[in-house]
């Protein structure tokens, strides 16, 4: 089992990156990719900085912790900014087993895959839950 301290440290690193994104200091190329997305999707690891998508997109959220845990771990983040997580997942242990095959039109993971033990397994799970792959 992953310790709370590990999750805290891991998420603090992600938080630092996301704050830079929010302030416009990080990569801006994501918007070009997001412009191609439509339909029903899944975003993994959004925390308080979900992808800015078109109105034609509907998104469910998955993360290692729920909103109330995130509020406790990150008191510096405005709770209103935290996404409501529909799926609590551990990509290293169970992958996306809780999700149906070919259920989503797209999946977004920003700054997540580099933190998993076996990225190839995670990619296989992503291919399983999307209807068709158009872009990585």
What are these regions (language model features)?
Residues 1-35:
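Membrane-proximal basic amphipathic "stem/tether" segments
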Residues 36, 102-103:
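Alpha-helix C-terminal capping/helix-to-coil transition sites in glycosyltransferase folds
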Residues 54, 117, 131:
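Short conserved AdoMet
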Residues 120-134:
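A short glycine-rich, Lys/Arg-flanked "PGG" loop and its adjoining helix->strand segment in the class I
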Residues 111-115:
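A short His-aromatic
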């Amino acid at each position: 089992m992953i310790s709370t301290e590990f999750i805290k440290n891991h998420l603090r690193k992600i938080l630092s990156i996301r704050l830079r994104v929010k302030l416009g200091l990080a990569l801006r190329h994501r918007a070009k990719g997001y412009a191609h997305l439509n339909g029903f999707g899944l975003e993994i690891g959004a925390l308080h900085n979900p992808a800015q998508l078109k109105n034609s997109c509907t998104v469910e959220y998955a993360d290692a912790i729920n909103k109330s845990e995130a509020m406790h771990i990150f008191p510096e983040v405005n709770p209103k900014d935290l996404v409501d997580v529909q799926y609590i997942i551990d990509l290293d242990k169970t992958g996306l087993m809780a999700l149906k095959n070919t259920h989503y039109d797209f999946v977004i993971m920003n700054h997540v895959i580099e933190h998993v033990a076996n990225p190839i397994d995670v990619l296989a799970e992503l291919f399983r839950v999307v209807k068709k792959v158009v872009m990585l």
